[in-house]
From Swiss-Prot:
Domain of life: Bacteria
Catalytic residues identified in the record: S101
Biological-process GO terms, alphabetical: carbohydrate metabolic process; peptidoglycan biosynthetic process; UDP-N-acetylglucosamine biosynthetic process
Keyword list, A-Z: Isomerase, Magnesium, Metal-binding, Phosphoprotein
Protein name: Phosphoglucosamine mutase 2
Cofactor(s) this protein requires: Mg(2+)
Length: 450
């Protein structure tokens, strides 16, 4: 049975528009509380990012959980990975994150997970949706008796505990003293976390986009808009810059020359360091969109590489299947399962800084050995909803075969349908940009002929 409200990243949408309304949030909290209580859950921990709508949704979910007889612990604005960690630390039975990650302020979302940081299983989500439908359509939300109502407490030392956890990831024989770092917190959940972590480890920190006002989260800043970070690194003559997104589950770097170091390059740095330190377990998991340059660079170090479907959840699945520890996406979702159960921007950044210090090189130098291949990406708009038919056609398959023959071992071809628009995305990457462009245009022409 397919899920009605829960997507791959919980429930998400435009604030004030169903399902991101206070009524829906309260009834979702109640339904989740009923299902979780049936498995022995006594307390749920709630964290959020810095969107103004977070207060409204937090209060609504809190009311629903309390009505179901579940206690609530509030930790305020906190990175998504911090909520996963703190749910376990504070002995809560489950966690809730109120965030829409890198989306604009007018969006928000609600995500539930266990105290081990994993999302609820499909059966639990279906049970929650069944109760939620009753509450929405038949006003069937029943409140427990007064003496059984859930109690609510606010935890004031959550940030300090998470900061100490992050610092514990960093090698105890190293210090960031002597490094000048620019940190862009995207006016998001890490604004009071990330700068303090680096400062307490000895770095000189220039903090930008660290004054959230409820509407400026991800607004031309953070991991998805690196211009201001690049400028700040150059102006302050910093050693490097670090940018996170609104809920701090993805990270990007800028080197001292102002050049972007993306998720694929971060994976290379972590894998190279693990290989040199003798801590490498298996290989690295990327995605279908990971740059071929990463695969080539890892192969040169005899490090295996696998591609998962696009999406950090699929990277996690592949890591668990293989028993490998390092994986991620070019967008900056970086996983190192030896240190965190989910993508954690602060933890990943510390592992990169540790690798840089251990190498004795600058960030620019350590990443220079990985040569990213130029990618050509063409979006072919369809006149009908027939992407699957086109991708399965003999003509398109033949065009791909011909392109791969031309590229040989120097490139690759990837065709994907968009999950949100009537598009087929044609991606070609190779050592020869002109060849990539020509092959991408040829395949796009074949796709357009349908």
């Amino acid at each position: 049975m397919s899920r009605k409200y829960f997507g791959t990243d919980g429930v998400r949408g435009r604030v004030g528009t169903f399902p991101i309304t206070p009524d829906f949030a309260m009834k979702l909290g109640w339904a989740a509380g009923k299902v979780l209580a049936s498995t022995g859950t006594q307390e749920v921990l709630i964290g959020k990012d810095t969107r103004s709508s977070g207060y409204m949704l937090e209060s609504a979910i809190e009311a629903g959980l309390s009505a179901a007889g579940v206690n609530v612990a509030l930790i305020g604005p906190m990175p998504t990975p911090a909520v996963a960690y703190l749910a376990s630390t504070f002995r809560a039975d489950a966690g809730v994150v109120i965030s829409a990650s890198h989306n604009p302020f007018y969006d928000n979302g609600i995500k539930f997970f266990s105290n081990s940081g994993t999302k609820l299983n499909d059966q639990q989500e279906l049970e929650i949706e069944a109760l939620l439908d009753q509450a929405l359509n038949h006003n069937a939300m029943e409140c427990v008796s007064s003496e059984l109502l859930g109690k609510v407490r606010r935890i004031t030392d959550a940030a300090g505990r998470y900061i100490e956890f992050c610092k514990g990831v960093f090698a105890k024989d190293l210090t960031l003293a002597g490094l000048k770092i620019v940190v862009d917190s995207a006016n998001g959940a890490a604004y009071h976390i990330a700068p303090n972590v680096y400062r307490e480890l000895g770095a000189e920190v220039i903090s930008i986009n660290d004054k959230p006002n409820g509407t400026n989260i991800n607004d031309h800043c953070g991991a998805t808009h690196l211009d201001s970070l690049q400028t700040a690194v150059m102006v302050h003559e910093a050693d490097l810059g670090i940018a996170m997104d609104g809920d701090a589950d993805r990270v990007m770097f800028v080197d001292h020359n102002g050049h972007v170091v993306d998720g694929d390059q971060i994976l290379y740095i972590l894998a190279k360091s693990a290989k040199q330190q003798g801590t490498m377990t298996g290989g690295v998991v990327g995605t279908l969109m990971s740059n071929l340059g990463l695969e080539i660079a890892l192969k040169e170090m005899d490090i295996p590489f696998k591609r998962a479907k696009v999406g950090d959840r699929y990277v996690v699945e592949q890591l668990k299947q293989t028993g490998w520890r390092i994986g991620g996406e070019g967008s900056g979702h970086i996983l190192h399962l030896d240190h965190a159960s989910t993508g954690d921007a602060v933890v990943a950044s510390l592992l990169v800084l540790q690798a840089v210090l251990q190498s004795g090189q600058s960030l620019a130098e350590i990443v220079s050995c990985m040569k990213k291949l130029p990618q050509v990406l063409l979006n072919v708009r369809l006149t009908a909803n027939n992407a699957d038919e086109i991708l399965a056609s003999a003509a398109v398959k033949q065009a791909v075969i011909e392109a791969e023959a031309v590229l040989a071992e120097n490139g690759r071809v990837l065709l994907r349908k968009s999950g949100t628009e009537p598009l087929i995305r044609v991606m070609v990457e190779s050592t020869d940009p002109e060849m990539s462009q020509a092959q991408a245009e040829h395949i796009a022409k074949v796709v357009t002929s349908f």
